[in-house]
């Protein structure tokens, strides 16, 4: 696949606990989630530098891969295999990510269903991107919406959070069902 198996997004604010939330734990690091930004380039610096075309980049990547494979054969460190895999994924993302992130391809009806402004980061945008990722074979998608742990003004806090998440959450389930993807997708909503 041109996309990672495990993608993490947030609605723009920080994520309590940070990258430890999607780390691989006791599993090999190939199982670590890849954080996507909710707008623009999903991963910073994934584009080729100015003056580097796809052929030059492929040649460079092949050389680095050969050196990494040689080192992997010498030391047997599984982290080297992860590095090789990550480099290949980054190369593939350069072509697949722009199309994935372009929500202007969606119909006005779909954008309205989610309550999504395609130009602004939001929970709705993350849910619509999640649906597009499911269509493209991403197996695990984690969307964080911070701010639920209210210690004062609980009613105001939760009213705002519900307003930001309810429509898009329902739209995601409805849209997956409409596309015939809900029956092969497990949706968990938790806090």
Residue ranges and their predicted role:
Residues 1-191:
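Ligand-binding pockets and gating/stacking loops
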């Amino acid at each position: 696949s041109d996309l990672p198996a495990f993608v993490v997004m947030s609605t723009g604010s920080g994520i309590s606990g940070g990258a430890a939330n999607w780390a691989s734990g006791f599993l090999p690091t190939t199982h670590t989630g890849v954080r996507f930004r909710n707008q623009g380039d999903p991963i910073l610096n994934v584009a080729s530098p100015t003056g580097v075309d796809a052929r030059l980049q492929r040649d460079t990547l092949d050389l680095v891969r050969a050196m990494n494979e040689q080192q992997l054969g010498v030391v047997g460190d599984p982290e080297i295999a992860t590095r090789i895999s990550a480099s290949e994924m980054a190369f593939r993302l350069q072509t697949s990510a722009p199309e994935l992130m372009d929500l202007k391809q969606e119909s006005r009806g779909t954008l309205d269903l989610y309550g999504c402004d395609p130009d602004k980061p939001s929970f709705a945008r993350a849910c619509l991107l999640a649906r597009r990722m499911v269509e493209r074979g991403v197996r695990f998608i984690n969307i964080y919406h911070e701010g639920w742990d209210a210690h004062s003004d609980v009613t105001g806090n939760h009213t705002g959070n519900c307003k930001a998440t309810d429509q898009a959450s329902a739209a995601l389930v409805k849209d997956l069902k409409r596309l015939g993807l809900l029956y092969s997708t497990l949706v968990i909503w938790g806090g």
